[in-house]
Amino acid sequence: MLRTPYGDVYENHECVEAVKSAVGLLESLGHICVEDYPPLDVHYHEARILVQSVGTNAWIERVAKGSGLPISEDTLEPLVYKAYLEARNVTASAYVAAKSELTKVMRDLGQFMEHYDILISPTMGIMPLEAGFYNPFSRPEMPVHDWVLERRRWSGNTAMCNVTGQPSI
């Protein structure tokens, strides 16, 4: 995959060149490699963010109960606390709808993978970031949703593998 599943171009050519190099090696060993992309709509990230946020809340509440620590801005990182507060407002119907959407993504990717053994893609679409850049503390005003979507440009395929259970290296 020389671009993201939804058509975005990777920001760093070195990441794409690494994929091309891996494909060249596989072809030299006799494997047939084709360029193809799973039928994913970028909007599945909305459902992924919602489900992940609710799951994180459950984890936070279990840890708080077990540790005796309160759930507050004093015990959680700012972005995590902000995400916790936002996810408390998710309704059951919104959660079920998001899970249904992710199930469709899983089935669509499963059907796509019936034709292939592996996907070769950049794990990251950019070169390593400077220390501190990936730090949510640097932009506390940024909504959690926007921060998660910004990360998508860095790791365009990782979420797809996380949602569907596809192996990823």
Predicted regions and their residues:
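Short, surface-exposed loop/helix-turn segments at secondary-structure junctions
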Residues: 129-155
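Short helix-loop capping/hinge segments that flank enzyme active sites or metal/cofactor-binding pockets
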Residues: 1-4, 53-110, 124-127, 131-133
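Gly/Ser-rich, acidic/histidine-flanked active-site/gating loops
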Residues: 1-50, 86-89, 94
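A short alpha->beta transition loop at the rim of the catalytic pocket in nucleotide-sugar-dependent
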Residues: 165
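A short beta-strand signature within small-molecule sensing/ligand-binding domains used
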Residues: 168-169
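Conserved short alpha-helical elements in the N-terminal third of ANL/AMP-binding
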Residues: 160-162
